[in-house]
């Protein structure tokens, strides 16, 4: 399973770059596997949060990998987390999940901006995987990879 592959990768890769990258790829693969043929899902999702920070995440689970990124951080680290890895996490997730993701965020507090991005992403995923009436594949092609 994807989880077992991830566990083996993390045993070998001890630095944060590879651990975050591998985790995101496998998480994306798990979502893709769990959705199967994607029959009946909403396919799209988006959200906007929090405090002085704002994040917008647009998601399409249509089977093509793409990340559009419009967020910058004023700090290099939040605690022990390298902020540059935020974008890389989402690029890796897109690769594993075969999804389109557009992220736009701004704010003064780097911690709040990153938190807003992850919360918006979670809400977007919840919207996109929600079952809709009709149970059809949400594509004019009749299938999604």
Model-derived regions: residue spans:
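Single conserved hydrophobic/aromatic residue that forms the stacking wall/gate
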Residues: 1-7, 11
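N-terminal auxiliary interaction/assembly segments of multi-subunit proteins
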Residues: 12-21
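Ordered, amphipathic secondary-structure segments that act as subunit-interaction surfaces
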Residues: 20-42
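Non-catalytic, interaction-prone regions of core transcription and DNA-replication machinery
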Residues: 29, 36, 51-52, 67, ...
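Intrinsic, low-complexity N-terminal interaction/targeting segments
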Residues: 38-97
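Short, highly charged C-terminal tails/helix-capping segments
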Residues: 47-49, 108-112, 135-145
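Mixed-charge, glycine-accented linear interaction segment located at domain edges/termini
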Residues: 64, 78-135
């Amino acid at each position: 399973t994807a989880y077992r592959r991830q566990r083996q990768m993390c045993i070998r890769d001890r630095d944060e770059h590879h651990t975050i990258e591998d985790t995101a790829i496998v998480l994306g693969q798990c979502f893709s596997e769990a959705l199967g043929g994607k029959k009946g899902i909403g396919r799209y999702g988006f959200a906007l949060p929090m405090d002085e920070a704002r994040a917008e995440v647009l998601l399409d689970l249509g089977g093509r990998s793409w990340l559009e990124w419009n967020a910058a951080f004023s700090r290099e680290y939040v605690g022990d987390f390298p902020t540059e890895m935020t974008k890389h996490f989402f690029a890796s997730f897109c690769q594993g999940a075969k999804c389109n993701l557009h992220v736009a965020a701004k704010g003064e507090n780097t911690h709040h901006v990153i938190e807003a991005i992850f919360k918006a992403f979670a809400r977007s995923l919840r919207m996109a995987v929600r079952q809709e009436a009709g149970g059809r594949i949400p594509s004019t092609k009749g299938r999604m990879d």
